UniProtKB/Swiss-Prot annotation:
Membrane-protein topology: Peripheral membrane protein
Gene: tagH
Domain of life: Bacteria
One GO molecular-function entry: ABC-type teichoic acid transporter activity
Protein name as annotated: Teichoic acids export ATP-binding protein TagH
Reactions catalysed according to its record: ATP + H2O + teichoic acidSide 1 = ADP + phosphate + teichoic acidSide 2
Key words of the record: ATP-binding, Cell membrane, Membrane, Nucleotide-binding, Translocase, Transport
InterPro entries (UniProt xref): AAA+_ATPase (IPR003593), ABC_transporter-like_ATP-bd (IPR003439), ABC_transporter-like_CS (IPR017871), ABC_transpr_TagH-like (IPR015860), Bact_Polysacc_Export_ATP-bd (IPR050683), P-loop_NTPase (IPR027417)
Organism, scientific name: Listeria monocytogenes serovar 1/2a (strain ATCC BAA-679 / EGD-e)
Amino acid sequence: MDKNIKVSFKHVSKEYDLYQNKSDKIKGLFLPKSKRVQSFWALRNVCFDVYDGETVGLIGINGSGKSTISNIMSGVIPPTQGEVVINGETSLIAIAVGLKGPLSGLENIRLKLLMHGLKGSQIDSLLPSIIEFADIGDFINQPIKNYSSGMRSRLGFAISVHTDPDILVVDEALSVGDQTFYQKCVDKINEFKAQGKTIVFVSHSLGQVKSLCDKIIWMHHGEVREIGDAAEVAEKYDEFVKWFNKQPNDFKKKYQKEQKEKQKLPQEKIYPTPNANKYKMGLFDKCFLVVLLALLVLFGSLISTGKSFMGLFSATDNKVEQVTKVDKRTDWK
């Protein structure tokens, strides 16, 4: 029986504008696309499917687009082009993702569980297990802005694995922390694998990916370079890394610069996001929107001023009425 697709990326691209200052952001609202600031394509035409029960690894050098994929997959950011289909609830595990610095560890646990739709009684029943798994001692009652990266990773991992997600996205969350906690996380991931859950594992560690994953997606400067069996793709990636590291520094810098410049080139809309053009505003629409907002502000000011005048007249009427009553009482006497 064929497995169901849990995650599907079809011709997905992600563009960022490389703003240099605040005025560039304002220009970006009004100027045509061709006259805006320089763009950067973090992802370009990415296609892959992740099936039910698979554990898939995302590998690649820095800036290859791994975290961008995990953020799109988890709904943190939208794609610029293409179609993303997620069949199930996704939980992203990354260092400090979704954690609020001023809040304590305990408060963050409650907040994240509430955001996952859990009720008070359910949260209370999960708290002891999460606190025990995180194993950060008395720091659980301290603001997490005072936590080390390892402690934040521990807390984030502990919360996410206790929300019972359909799809677990682990983004470099095992790159910090000691070996004891790492093994605890690996055991939990293997437990999820045994339950048939879908796992996407993002890491620089080829050893971790090979030991945990069935399939590997090799990302290279925003594009898919290879997809296939974990052992085969890992071997090819390892060969590339060894070859690259042997090259002179001048060659490395030139190669990386060329790849970055390539990511700045214009992108053809191979697979537009459904209904994207329907909501795209032209220059006239943007100017109309600004004028409309200005009129609304002016109208609000006039209403506020009118209320002030009405209040003044009302106060005057009350005074006149009080004087009249006093005069009547005087006449009666």
